């Protein structure tokens, strides 16, 4: 009844107006699953490869080759197989591709099929996706890491760090968490506007004011949390995504906005100062993706009291994560389905992290769609944290709205991760 009878891929547009792959998978019993694939702006060198067409069409960013791969080669290989055999099908597609980084068929082709298969199988079993993937224990609603000020590759301003996030750990449930975040977001907009700053929003819905430094951005956020009626370091904490690979040049960290260049040790100390001065409980990509020594220094400095998230460092890859665990670097992994390119490998990365006592943060990309799969996956994996942008742009809100629905579906079973994510 759950045999795959048809797969249809198409080229659609993401939130940045760039093409991406959408896949529909049909099963023998009439069930259908649909998934759209996200795309990143700051991508790690070790990520699985998106297949793009090149040429003039869409300025080289078309995905007709990936769509063609799904509709022909991938369907020919997996048509007729049982959609409930997720791991087997994912492994077949990886073997069919035959490259270490999915560059022949494209991670965007393989992932679209992988996610759509899970959604079709969930529909066939009469279960919501979070329950189908996560089983009976999937009930933990994640703390949202809401990206309200943008810099770096996500903004045209002098701020070197890419994201400044708020984490409403003091909320009682996801609905309250979203409300708290929304109130701080709108308060920040007023504060920025009153000081003459631009309040247009970036790719992920955050503001991109012309501030010179990370402390200047953090001061605005502290003020906005308080003015919205919350206590920084009690109701609401802060997270950073430095995306420091983007400004790591010739072995040094070049903070152009702040007008200084730091050696790895000094960069780690600068981040430690910020963690000690502000209620920062999470720092993502504080050091560059191949600066393992710098990562070790940072982990030794603040790893006992701050979540240190590897994004470009680990690229949702279990093998790289195991290397990091052995070396004692970082204590958390950012999970982006399109960095690794299949559902089963994504779930494996989360499991590897949890077994080693590392946390996992489910994440969107800067190029998103209305697809809300990651909301279900955050609950399915009980990872306790989700990063899906600000409180603006429907491509971000689709995920928050889905979490609100899931909480309602779970009823009294639902638990909100809240303060359980705090370290030390």
UniProtKB/Swiss-Prot annotation:
Its EC number is 4.2.1.11. Mg(2+) binds at residues 241, 284, 311. GO terms for biological process: glycolytic process. Pfam families: Enolase_C (PF00113), Enolase_N (PF03952). It is an enzyme of class 4 (lyase). Keywords: Cytoplasm, Glycolysis, Lyase, Magnesium, Metal-binding, Secreted. Pathway: Carbohydrate degradation; glycolysis; pyruvate from D-glyceraldehyde 3-phosphate: step 4/5. It is found in: Cytoplasm; Secreted; Cell surface. It catalyses: (2R)-2-phosphoglycerate = phosphoenolpyruvate + H2O. Binds a second Mg(2+) ion via substrate during catalysis. The active site is at residues 204, 336. Belongs to the enolase family. Catalyzes the reversible conversion of 2-phosphoglycerate (2-PG) into phosphoenolpyruvate (PEP). It is essential for the degradation of carbohydrates via glycolysis. This is Enolase. It comes from Agrobacterium fabrum (strain C58 / ATCC 33970).
